[in-house]
């Protein structure tokens, strides 16, 4: 375990009040791409996702379907697991907050919070958003009006749905005591919250003053019991945030669990949506400070997915009423799983809201995958079969006078690519791979292998060209592996490099000249058949 550095990446754990959707899939694919890159780059990766099963919202969803909360959450788990399997998600752990390990960890957290002095008992009287499981003060509440059909209503400032007035006995976490400590954290670690403008939002929120947080509920019972006060259950976010440490062995009294926690914690990267950034960048670090635990290194908040209106060009919120809602299966049906992953990771900027459209999906797929990457693989394999009996030419020696522009493009490509992947600049990382692919396609046109094949005196030059094309494919496949693991592995298999697909030394794999000469090359069907325009 400890022979490699640890890299721990997480998604949020997802509410089970409804099926997984495009947004949850987006968060999960981001984390998966990062996990796959880090495994290839030499890290021992733990990639965690899961389900957030407690809280009033889940209890209401269960009642609506005539089930107990546990029955409802059990019925939902297969939907999440099946979609992640379909989308080639490589998570190492799937945590459910109804598991015994989470109960033990949360109850251990309560005991430590009690010892810390940052916990007190009181009464909460204020506004609560059930869909968002969030408390709001009177000054934060949005007032309804005639224009939006909610005159006199108190609305959630985030989701704009009606709030409930809640009055109940509760335990409070002294969040207000951590204002200065949080601001110091942001000053000393300016990359704690990413992108930069999200850090500015978080800082501004904290500078405005923090209220103590109600962390137990007594008006319903679907939650983890507070161990020292019967009738209180844990506030859903106080429970949910701890899942990241639970999965590393927190709260388990064994040498093995303590070793795992020491190795894995703190997390390197939490991937979250911008709507839950305050929980992860304010409440979560304050909780950890209170119990004297290390803080995660980075929290990356991605934007929302919107739909580009084909007629107006405007970005619109997805909704069934507008008829513009897009489900994951809709995208899979159009692009396939690998095209789905590639589009969302390379054409949608993670840090900002991204307007998507089927038209743009087709454009990206055809331009990058069908016309460029897939075409390079097909043409190079076909020429290997035609001119070299289906084998890679011998690896060139250094005693030739031929220029090699592809080796020049590949020089230093790992470091450039890795820097961009580390910064979650997936479009930039993709551009490194596509630069090599485009250069290889231009190389075919410039070198004209078909003409070289007609001149026996230029046989060495032909072999040199075909070898370089296959070597460019090998390196590009490694760079695209985190985005499209199945087709990238297939590209490697077709040039007899299948053993490299599980490589954990990406830097070495990207060194020019790794392709062994004489190995079989297979043509195969097109990896990315061109899409015809939608009717």
Please report, for each region that a protein language model flagged, where it lies by residue.
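Basic, alpha-helical terminal appendages of large translation-related enzymes
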Residues: 1-6, 50, 122-127, 131, ...
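Structured secondary-structure scaffolds
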Residues: 2-49, 101-105, 155-386, 431-433
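N-terminal Rossmann-like or analogous alpha/beta NTP/dinucleotide-binding catalytic cores
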Residues: 2-120
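Short, glycine/charge-rich beta-strand/loop segments that flank catalytic centers
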Residues: 93-104, 122-135, 199, 301-306
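Cys/His-rich short segments
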Residues: 116-179, 183
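A glycine-rich phosphate-binding loop feature that marks nucleotide/adenosyl-phosphate handling sites
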Residues: 127-132, 303-307, 359-360, 393-401, ...
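Long, amphipathic alpha-helical stalk/connector segments used for oligomerization, subunit docking
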Residues: 349-352, 356-365, 380-429
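Generic structural concept
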Residues: 370, 374, 407, 411, ...
């Amino acid at each position: 375990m400890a022979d490699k550095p640890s890299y721990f990446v997480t998604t949020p754990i997802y509410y089970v009040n409804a099926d997984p959707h495009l947004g949850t899939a987006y968060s999960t694919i981001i984390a998966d791409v990062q996990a796959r890159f880090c495994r290839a780059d030499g890290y021992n990766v733990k990639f965690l996702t899961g389900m957030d099963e407690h809280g009033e919202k889940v209890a209401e969803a269960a009642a609506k379907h005539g089930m107990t909360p546990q029955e409802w959450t059990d019925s939902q788990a297969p939907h999440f697991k099946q979609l992640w399997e379909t989308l080639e998600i490589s998570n190492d752990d799937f945590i459910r907050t109804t598991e015994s390990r989470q109960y033990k960890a949360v109850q251990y957290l309560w005991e430590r919070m009690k010892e810390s002095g940052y916990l007190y008992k009181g009464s909460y009287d204020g506004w609560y958003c059930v869909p968002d499981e969030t408390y709001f003060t009177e000054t934060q509440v949005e007032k309804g009006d005639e224009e939006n059909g909610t005159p006199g209503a108190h609305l959630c400032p985030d989701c704009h749905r009606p709030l409930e007035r809640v009055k109940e006995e509760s335990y409070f976490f002294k969040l207000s005591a951590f204002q200065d400590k949080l601001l110091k954290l942001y000053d000393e670690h300016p990359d704690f919250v990413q992108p930069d403008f999200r850090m500015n939002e978080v800082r501004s929120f904290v500078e405005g003053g923090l209220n103590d947080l109600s962390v137990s509920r007594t008006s319903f019972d679907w939650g983890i019991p507070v161990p020292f006060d019967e009738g209180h259950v844990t506030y859903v976010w106080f429970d949910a945030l701890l899942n990241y440490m639970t999965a590393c062995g927190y709260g388990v009294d064994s040498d093995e669990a303590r070793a795992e926690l020491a190795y894995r914690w703190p997390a390197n990267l939490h991937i979250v949506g911008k709507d839950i950034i305050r929980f992860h960048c304010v409440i979560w670090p304050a909780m950890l400070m209170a119990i004297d635990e290390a803080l995660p290194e980075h929290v990356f908040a991605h934007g929302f997915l919107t739909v580009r209106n084909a007629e107006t060009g405007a970005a619109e919120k997805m909704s069934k009423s507008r008829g513009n809602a897009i489900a994951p299966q809709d995208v899979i049906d159009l692009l396939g799983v690998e095209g789905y992953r590639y589009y969302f990771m390379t054409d949608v900027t993670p840090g900002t809201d991204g307007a998507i459209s089927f038209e743009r999906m087709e454009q990206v797929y055809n331009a990058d995958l069908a016309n460029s990457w897939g075409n390079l693989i097909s043409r190079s394999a076909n020429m290997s079969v035609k001119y070299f009996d289906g084998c890679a030419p011998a690896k060139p020696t250094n005693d030739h006078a031929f220029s090699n522009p592809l080796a020049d493009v590949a020089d230093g490509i790992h470091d450039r690519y890795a820097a961009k992947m580390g910064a979650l600049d997936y479009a930039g990382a993709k551009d490194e791979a596509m630069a090599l692919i485009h250069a290889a396609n231009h190389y075919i046109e410039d070198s004209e292998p078909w003409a070289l094949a007609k001149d026996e005196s230029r046989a060495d030059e032909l072999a040199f060209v075909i070898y370089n094309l296959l070597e460019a494919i090998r390196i590009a496949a490694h760079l695209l592996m985190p985005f499209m693991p199945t087709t990238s592995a297939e590209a490697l298999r077709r040039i007899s490099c299948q053993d490299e697909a599980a490589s954990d030394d990406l830097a070495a794999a990207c060194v020019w000249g790794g392709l062994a000469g004489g190995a079989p090359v297979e043509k195969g069907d097109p990896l990315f058949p061109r899409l015809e325009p939608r009717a």
